[in-house]
Amino acid sequence: MEFRSVAERICGDIVLSENSGEALRKWRSIFNASQSDLARKLGISPSVISDYESGRRKPGTAFLKKFVCALIELDGERGYQVLSKYRYFLESDHKAVLDIAEYQKTAEPSEFCEVIEGKMLTHFDKAIHGHTVIDSINAILSLNAFDFYRLYGLTSERALIFTRVSTGRSPMVAVRVSNLKPSAVVLHGLEAERVDEMAKKIAEIERIPLVVTEIAIGEIVKRLRRKFA
């Protein structure tokens, strides 16, 4: 399988990160690789990986290339369990996706809600490692079953933020039938009283925090990127 676009995306994210150590740790976590697994593949000791992730060492271009290739090779040894889920997203952009970001640090649901001034309708403790902002109307009109996986970026442990929703039922039904489950679902521009009971029921069944917020979507993106990305 060809994953050059994946490698370029990961390298770019690490290089542009304000904390390269946290970025390295984040990508290792996304690929479910232990420090020992990665060290074995790179031919170095786990303590060296720890030094890079803690900031005691700064990654150069040569190390970054080896690091990313090692992650992809490890995933290949496991049948591309990680990358096969997200290749559709990486192949092209889609007009239904308004914004997408992977976080440098984990966001807890309560902290996430505070940042976007959201009200949580179902309460579950899930780690949030990114977000995708989705135009619900364009998603309904243009996304097929395979396209839906594009919404998850490089990890399903993210918040799916749906805009232009009327009751929230359609987004939650889509989540219900999908194999990948988000860490949270945000219904933008919708008052809590208008959320469909079935949407809330699905959130309870899937154990997903369901959140509503009414602040401007541009402000939401700016706040989330400033706080977590």
Curated annotation (Swiss-Prot):
Residue span(s) of domain HTH cro/C1-type: 24-78
Tagged with keyword DNA-binding: yes
Cross-referenced CDD domains: HTH_XRE
Keyword Phosphoprotein: no
InterPro entries: Cro/C1-type_HTH, Lambda_DNA-bd_dom_sf, Tscrpt_reg_HTH_MJ1545_prd
Keywords: DNA-binding, Transcription, Transcription regulation
UniProt feature coiled coil, ranges: none
Membrane-crossing segments per the record: none
Protein name: Uncharacterized HTH-type transcriptional regulator AF_2414
